[in-house]
Amino acid sequence: MSMIYITLNIIAYVIDVRSLILDVRRLVFSLILGIVEGLTEFLPISSTGHMILVENILNCMDDSVIAFTVIIQLGAILSITKIFWSQLYGMSMICIKKIFFKQHDDHNHLCIRHIFLGTFPGIMLGMIFYEKIGLIFELTYIMYGLIIGGIFLLVGELCASKEPRVSRINNITYLQAFLIGCFQCLAFWPGFSRAGATIGGGLVVGLDRRISSEFSFFLAVPIIFGSAVLTLYHYRSCIGLMDVLLLIAGSATAFFIALFTVRYFLKIVKNVSLIPFAIYRFLLAGGIYWGLMT
């Protein structure tokens, strides 16, 4: 009996060690994805493309991992909320005053209507094709998305050379907001980049780089938040306590990395064109092509 007891204890110990090693690996993986998410979400280089590329490199591509990459975007969104809290709060108060207190401001303001018009096309398209979008999360589609998205950035830069440009975010019109929202639908193609679609789209419709970037960040809040919550609900039965802890770790990492990335990007984007980002996209697409061919 003592031998059986010792054997069972050894087996239990081995299982615990293996489980611990597996949990550590999952934690490291979640931190890596959080870093990648924070670095790429708000740059016009496709965060989804980078996340899927990392998942393929680490050989851990499955539906649950794809869901994880979507949900940890909540951390990146919280960074935008922190950076632009005063503007977001101001928009909300203007909306509340108009609806409940019938107060109208004669000055032009970026308001909830602009955000709604900028997100409405994406919401409608996402609701229609939600189940099918995941079918194109493959490296081949990402490669083409990177190339076409890079060309779109070059088109945006060509338009940016024309004057005059909208240089104050409060001067964005409803039509411009809606058109940028239509461009945002291009981001359903993995590799195209939501930031690339909206920033490039903003340049096409007459915004300067910084204002186009800021509006892109504002549009990210409802779109990414809605996508993450919908994905979380869809996979709710598959998420355990350990998964929740890993999501928190990945989201927290994405939050702090995105804080740095967004602030630095806003400092340089007014004087630095999007051409370097387009070149990077072409090089990354070439690397993916080389990897697929070897």
From Swiss-Prot:
User: Per UniProt, what is the membrane topology?
Assistant: Multi-pass membrane protein
InterPro entries noted in UniProt: UppP
Q: What EC numbers are recorded for this enzyme?
A: 3.6.1.27
The organism sits in which domain of life? Bacteria
Q: Which Pfam families match?
A: BacA
One example of the protein's molecular function in GO is:
undecaprenyl-diphosphatase activity
Keyword Hydrolase listed? The answer is: yes
Reactions this protein catalyses: di-trans,octa-cis-undecaprenyl diphosphate + H2O = di-trans,octa-cis-undecaprenyl phosphate + phosphate + H(+)
User: According to its UniProt entry, what is the function of this protein?
Assistant: Catalyzes the dephosphorylation of undecaprenyl diphosphate (UPP). Confers resistance to bacitracin.
Annotated protein name in UniProt: Undecaprenyl-diphosphatase
Gene name per UniProt: uppP
